[in-house]
Amino acid sequence: MLDAAVDIFSEKGMGITIQALADRVSVTQPLVHRYFRTRADLIAGIREKIQFAHWDPAWREVLTDRSHPLCERIPDFYARYLPHIYSARWYRSFWYAALSDPTFAQEFLARVHEELLLSIIGEARFAFGYPALECRPAGPREIELVWGMHSTTVFLGIRRYVYHTPVSPDLQTTVLDQMRAYLHTVPEVMEELMPSARKRTVIER
């Protein structure tokens, strides 16, 4: 029933009603009320489903597994992450939820930042021989650089499913191109930010 509610929300946003859900799943409105006593409860359930039900702790494990070079880990992460969000249902639902309540997007993006993007920065620091984040927190330039890679990749879905404009069908190559640009630029940025902090030279990125 909650999946059907998310489908409706992706189409109508905050225009969703208990009756619309009952009609979609071909049950009576009183039956829906057994699961969602109020419309606010329904919206809360949809929000939880969109925001965190798909979250996989293994994503961070992939990014921090140093038995593989970083240039393999980043594409592997996106190969696992994007299938969970790359659909009209998820993008449009997320968009509607964020417009109705900015804290929705803020909470989700905070988790992306803390668990995923800071992991990439930390692993890039290690790969290029710079201090760990525990010793020196990430600065604005490092943060915006990794957000640039992530945002460009994720924005493909917004262009396709929200704006309905053409995008490359080869998502894997787009991810690789963004990663290469990031790994090419990040050591230069780190050297500018921490010119005397580099400890070693690492060949495999």
Question: Locations of the language-model features?
Answer:
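Amphipathic alpha-helical linker/stalk segments
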Residues: 46-77
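Helix-turn-helix
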Residues: 4, 8-49
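Amphipathic alpha-helical interaction surfaces
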Residues: 80, 84-87, 118-126, 151-159, ...
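Hydrophobic/aromatic-rich alpha-helical bundle segments in the mid-to-C-terminal region
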Residues: 129-180, 189-201
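Amphipathic alpha-helical segments used for helix-helix packing
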Residues: 85-110, 158-162
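Hydrophobic/aromatic residues within well-ordered alpha-helical segments
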Residues: 39, 46, 50, 77, ...
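Short alpha-helical scaffolding segments that buttress acidic/His motifs in well-ordered protein cores
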Residues: 78-81, 94-98, 149, 153, ...
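Amphipathic alpha-helical packing segments from all-alpha helical-bundle domains
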Residues: 93, 103-132, 144-147, 176-180
